[in-house]
Amino acid sequence: MSYQRRHSRWYERVLFSPPSLFFLGAMLAVCLPALERWGWGFWEYFDAVRVNTLGGAFVAFLLTGIVLYRFLRYPGASPVAYMIPTVTTLYGSLVGALFFLRLPYSRQVLFESYVVALLCCWVVYFIGRRYRTPKYALLPFGDYQPLMHHTCVEWRLLDKPDLGAVRYDAVVADLRDDDLAGEWERFLARCALAHIPVYHIKQISETLTGRVKIDHLHENQLGSLLPSPIYAFIKRGMDILAAVIAIPLFSPLMLATAVLIKLESPGPVMFLQNRVGKGNRDFRIYKFRSMCQNSEQHGAQFAQDGDMRVTRVGKVIRKLRIDELPQFFNVLKGDMSLIGPRPEQRTFVDQFDREIPFYMYRHIVRPGISGWAQVVHGYAADADDTRIKIEHDFYYIKNFSLWLDVLIVFKTIRTILTGFGAR
């Protein structure tokens, strides 16, 4: 029996393919404002204002589509949560660039294009939520039960090696299970021949949870975790630029924070502590002191909810992440990056290295002021939490890219506004 992949018919590919939606949205975001401002004959004459405005609007919308589409690759990145920030950031950057370069443009047309872009994104989102919820066929072998708790996917558990007349986006199976043999293997081959993707259960689990299991990492998987050296070089340049801009920008806030800390409690304003960074090398991290003096005189320990060592000023600056602003100096020195796994104390590193397999591998990249584990999982309060946090860190290393870093920046802003994960 031949199978068909979901949305594989020609009209479905046209209606639901990202390129088609990008092109249609871009035409609406460019042409509708132009028609309203200059009428039907706007294309008959192109002066500098029209070229700059319409060309800029097209590029801004195109980048919006690319960014939101890339975000969809990562768990918990619903487009509706980042739609307004993404569109606003890109159109705002366009206006800033045109203003800085002193190029003529129409503010009215750009504003209307911005509104149309938002509406287009909303329409595409609702169409996608209605018609593009993934539908996966799941084979009843291995550890498949946890996957079925993820409601963002429509699961169909197969009881025989046959899809019937139902069309699916993909087939998911534990390809290493010993019971997967005979008719089931031939069934997977037929699915592949019908251009229906066949995914290993671990691959789908990582995509849905944002975690890479670390209990049984094989040598070939470690190879896939190697971060891109090209992006690492580019990322370092962006880190330096961001630190050079952020340090003078936040200097008044850092000065005010230092004064408040000094007025509230005795002791130094800064909290200096050795942490473990890239290559398992120690460095000294800079933070504003948020706890009472000598808070770790009995040794390193995790901060807890309602920790009595935290001062009143400390509670505020921890919630808003102001205590971490001095770490921009660590970024400038090369000890840290803006985005990466959070650095731990040597005491904890040695302990976790004994308890958690492959723990040291997280030191293959620079630690960050913010990171995937912080914005998804929050603060790690014990060894079990740390194990989950490490799985998030491995996911970040495996998916080391500009798009994931941009998503983490957006999530970090949300984290600061909500106080998620603060102790």
Curated annotation (Swiss-Prot):
Residues 35-47, 101-107, 261-423 are cytoplasmic. GO terms for cellular component: membrane. It is found in: Membrane. Keywords: Lipopolysaccharide biosynthesis, Membrane, Transferase, Transmembrane, Transmembrane helix. It catalyses: di-trans,octa-cis-undecaprenyl phosphate + UDP-N-acetyl-alpha-D-galactosamine = N-acetyl-alpha-D-galactosaminyl-di-trans,octa-cis-undecaprenyl diphosphate + UMP. One of its GO terms (biological process) is O antigen biosynthetic process. It is an enzyme of class 2 (transferase). Residues 1-13, 69-79, 129-239 are extracellular. Pathway: Bacterial outer membrane biogenesis; LPS O-antigen biosynthesis. The chain crosses the membrane at residues 14-34, 48-68, 80-100, 108-128, 240-260. It is a multi-pass membrane protein. GO terms for molecular function: phosphotransferase activity, for other substituted phosphate groups. Its EC number is 2.7.8.40. Belongs to the bacterial sugar transferase family. PANTHER family: COLANIC BIOSYNTHESIS UDP-GLUCOSE LIPID CARRIER TRANSFERASE, UNDECAPRENYL-PHOSPHATE N-ACETYLGALACTOSAMINYL 1-PHOSPHATE TRANSFERASE-RELATED. This is UDP-N-acetylgalactosamine-undecaprenyl-phosphate N-acetylgalactosaminephosphotransferase. It comes from Aeromonas hydrophila. The lineage of its organism: Bacteria, Pseudomonadati, Pseudomonadota, Gammaproteobacteria, Aeromonadales. The gene is wecA.
